[in-house]
């Protein structure tokens, strides 16, 4: 990359970032937080945050990168995708109606508490089973890729560890105080550190716990944007340190700075992977929607499907094995746009942008239902569901459409099943006479008593 080529790329980069940041800032000023703001920030992080790191690696350390024309193609396609996404998200499909509708879901106090207890039980039980089978893998494995080897049993259980976070989200949304907010951080980070040591380097639960803590703080006004930036910088350094421990690296001096640059870029902003796909575009055999179906294979136990393929050819594995010819045992993230390119080439990019806009719109709709519901237990469940799905939005932007679809379906099924079991348990307890009603009076004593004072409303709560 020459200085002239860098200058051209920088102009395109600057225009793209200003365009997306302007739209995101206007949305933030309007609502402070919604899933469009979240997706936009994650999108900026994935496709634009890594550009300065790439430039420093090129000019400071002489690292070879993808030819400039493909870097430019990656940047332009990312900007075009966001423009189509934004139009899709903002397009109103039907008129707003003020007519109240009958609630499709009702949740009481007992059901809400049973739901988070079941979610937490799933997470703790699967962590315990994984630990009994494998011990502390962080101190046993010589390399991170060994996690996916046959020596480690019960790898599929890792997908259940995450449900500890939605459980703690329900607890927080039932109270929504600063103390509950801080307890959410302490509990989820402690659990994340435990899973990091047991699994041998998986940082996802830690990243999500910290990110959700920040998002909640922004929503409630407990932290400012400057505090968010400072926390983000702290998070980047923390993730770098955990990455060093994960890969067993001991670095110092210039090499430490070099390692920080490429690990941070690859962790938070694998945008060069999209450029690699454009470079190898003529070698790609479009997979259609097959990667989405294949990604569900990992959720099917081998005892139920004895002939289940051990190697799943989703978009990440196709990119790693077929495009990069990399068989190290780790799957390299193709990003959201990369997965669309693998599935259907250029034509899938606008179609994917429209679909993603509708998905984000749906999450915002559910989130608004939760915020505005008068039943605080139902509101807690709906908001915890939405915030719990943040991990799936991260998967969407970083890993791709196929990984997102399988994970969001899995998340909805487990979360919905816990709520259904909670309702069933409540019905059984109530039928057995173990649920007693607690009467709470909402006292609103007028300053001057009058004969026409309306009696205090009585609200029933289940214990």
Swiss-Prot record:
- What parts of the sequence cross the membrane? 6-26, 39-59, 65-85, 112-132, 154-174, 180-200, 201-221, 222-242, 340-360, 377-397, 408-428
Q: By which gene is this protein encoded? A: wzyE
Taxonomy-wise, where does this protein's organism fall, top ranks first?
Bacteria, Pseudomonadati, Pseudomonadota, Gammaproteobacteria, Enterobacterales
Relate the assembly described in the record. Probably part of a complex composed of WzxE, WzyE and WzzE.
InterPro entries under this entry?
WzyE
Superkingdom field: Bacteria
Could you tell me what this protein does?
Probably involved in the polymerization of enterobacterial common antigen (ECA) trisaccharide repeat units.
Asked if Mitochondrion is a keyword of the record, the answer is no
Can you say what this protein is called? Answer: Probable ECA polymerase
Give the membrane topology: Multi-pass membrane protein
Among the Pfam families in the record, one is: WzyE
Q: Name one GO cellular component term.
A: plasma membrane
Where in the cell is the protein located? Cell inner membrane
Keywords annotated in UniProt: Cell inner membrane, Cell membrane, Membrane, Transmembrane, Transmembrane helix
| Pathway assigned in UniProt | Bacterial outer membrane biogenesis; enterobacterial common antigen biosynthesis
Set out the biological process GO terms recorded for this chain's protein: enterobacterial common antigen biosynthetic process
Family in the record: Belongs to the WzyE family.
């Amino acid at each position: 990359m020459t200085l002239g080529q860098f200058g051209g790329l920088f102009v395109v980069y600057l225009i793209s970032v200003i365009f997306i940041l302007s739209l995101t800032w206007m949305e933030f000023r309007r609502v402070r937080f919604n899933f469009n703001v979240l997706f936009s920030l994650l999108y900026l992080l994935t496709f634009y945050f890594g550009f300065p790191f790439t430039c420093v690696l090129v000019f400071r350390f002489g690292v070879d990168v993808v030819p400039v024309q493909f870097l430019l193609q990656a940047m332009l396609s990312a900007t075009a995708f966001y423009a189509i996404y934004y139009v899709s998200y903002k397009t109103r499909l039907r008129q707003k109606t003020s007519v109240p509708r009958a609630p499709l879901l009702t949740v009481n106090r007992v059901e809400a508490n049973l739901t988070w207890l079941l979610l937490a039980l799933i997470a703790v039980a699967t962590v315990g089973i994984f630990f009994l089978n494998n011990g502390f893998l962080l101190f046993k494995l010589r390399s991170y890729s060994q996690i996916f080897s046959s020596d480690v049993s019960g790898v599929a259980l890792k997908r259940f560890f995450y449900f500890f976070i939605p459980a703690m989200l329900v607890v927080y949304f039932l109270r929504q105080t600063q103390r509950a907010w801080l307890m959410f951080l302490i509990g989820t980070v402690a659990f994340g550190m435990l899973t990091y040591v047991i699994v041998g380097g998986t940082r996802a639960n830690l990243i999500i716990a910290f990110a959700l803590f920040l998002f909640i703080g922004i929503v409630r006004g407990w932290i400012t944007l400057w505090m968010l930036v400072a926390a983000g910088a702290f998070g980047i350094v923390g993730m770098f340190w955990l990455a060093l421990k994960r890969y067993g690296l001991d670095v110092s001096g210039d090499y430490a700075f070099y390692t920080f640059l490429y690990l941070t870029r690859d962790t938070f902003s694998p945008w060069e992977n999209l450029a690699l796909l454009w470079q190898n575009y003529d070698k790609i055999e479009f997979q259609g929607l097959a990667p989405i179906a294949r990604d569900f294979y990992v959720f099917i136990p081998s005892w139920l499907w004895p002939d289940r393929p051990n190697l799943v050819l989703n978009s990440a594995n196709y990119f790693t094995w077929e495009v990069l010819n990399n068989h190290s045992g780790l799957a390299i993230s193709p990003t959201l746009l990369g997965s669309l390119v693998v599935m259907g080439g250029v034509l899938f990019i606008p179609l994917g942008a429209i679909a993603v806009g509708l998905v984000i719109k749906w999450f915002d709709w559910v989130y608004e239902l939760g915020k505005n519901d008068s039943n605080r237990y139902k509101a807690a469940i709906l908001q915890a569901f939405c915030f719990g799905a943040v991990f799936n939005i991260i998967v969407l932007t970083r890993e791709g459409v196929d990984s997102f679809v399988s994970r969001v379906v899995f998340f909805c099924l487990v979360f919905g099943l816990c709520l259904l079991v909670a309702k069933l348990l409540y019905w059984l307890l109530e039928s057995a006479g173990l649920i007693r009603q607690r009467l709470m009076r909402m006292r609103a004593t007028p300053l001057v008593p009058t004969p026409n004072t309306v009696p205090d409303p009585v609200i029933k709560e289940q214990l």
